[in-house]
Amino acid sequence: MREGGVPPPADAMDLPPPPPDVVHPAAKFCDLPGSVRYETTGVTMVAGGQTATIPPSLAFLKLPTNFCVHYYGKVGNPRQVRFAPSGELFVASPIGITTGGGAGGQSSIVYLPDDNRDGYADSVSIFQDRLPQTQGLLFTKTHFYYQDNTKIVRVPYQVGDRFPRGEREIVADITYHQSLLHWPKPLDEADDGTIYVGNGGDQGEACDLQRPFKGGIVRLDGSPGGLPIAKGFRNPIAVRCQRGTNKCFAIELAKDYSAEEGGREKLVPIREGDDWGYPCCATRDVPHVEVKQTADCSKTVPEDVSFLIGDTPFGFDFEPKKWPTPYKGNAFVALHGTAGPWQGARLVSVAVNLDTGDLMPSTTLGGVGGGMRNFGTGWDDTTLMHGRPAAVTFAEDGRLFLANDNNGDIIWIAPFELER
């Protein structure tokens, strides 16, 4: 038996995926049965959707006109979503205590194929089990990487694999600081092959003027624990790289309840040597109140993209330039909203300079401004019935997939003209 896994049936890795049932003739994704379409004249639904199990209503959701939303499937506590090169949606479903508080985790990485291409997941199957603390997922040309608590491990991967191929290998054991709450280790690969991993700090850290590494970004360099390259993070909850630019970014969930002292959540570039301030500084020249007289924040890197404390940016990905203007190439960010009422839970887009790959200055401080737009809203209608937006990924075909960690629903969104 594989370490930490389940044995596949004989020759399972050599079997092709199950044959598709009936492939719907729709030429565009938004014409598939079950699609909720946002027309200029109102909201309509394409008849003939899934009936074996009744999908949840998506009537609460508000999107721009000429877009559609479609239910895909359900996984308890989906904390990260990634597409395999062969099209299966992989989902990290942990049970370890997390800031999201999602229920029904499977302590596994599961996958959801759509072999008949009807827009719904065909099934939910376990790829790797016995993973109570897992979040980071990454496919490279040769391997599948994933988080197992403090460890980043990998298994050989070939297109179409639905079981681990061979023994797992520990790539790094990141123990510079081990947070019981901020244990997730998101990761991604830059265009040049560099892999970056987030490592969480803690809410109650005292300001140490020597600035040791605790929460920050680690580069996998072949050493046992990886190389710390950027510090001053409380909780780098998400890491993503933008294709074609060799640039990577991270979301920082900053000090709770610090809005009145200048605190803000951030979406920042990953660069070697950067110090983003925590736990001493909220941003450049803005020390946290308890160290106002002692902390020097003049060298803290200023952010270009900021969010109100409590908006709680949770996951993001970059649109692969298949959507129309003004969304082409944007970063799409899932906002988890405030604890309790989930106020502010929504999906926003952040404009990107398509020539350089840089994020345009954007903020939700004092209202949505700069290069940021509200894209999907409706989760925070006080009912607590629709989940909280958590993980985001784009499929190669251009659809945006969004997972809600509190109810497990996974949906996809597409513009009307996106072809299958």
Question: PLM features: what roles do these ranges have?
Answer:
Residues 71-76, 125-132, 171-179, 227-232, ...:
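Surface loop/turn motifs at the tips and blade-to-blade linkers of beta-strand repeat domains
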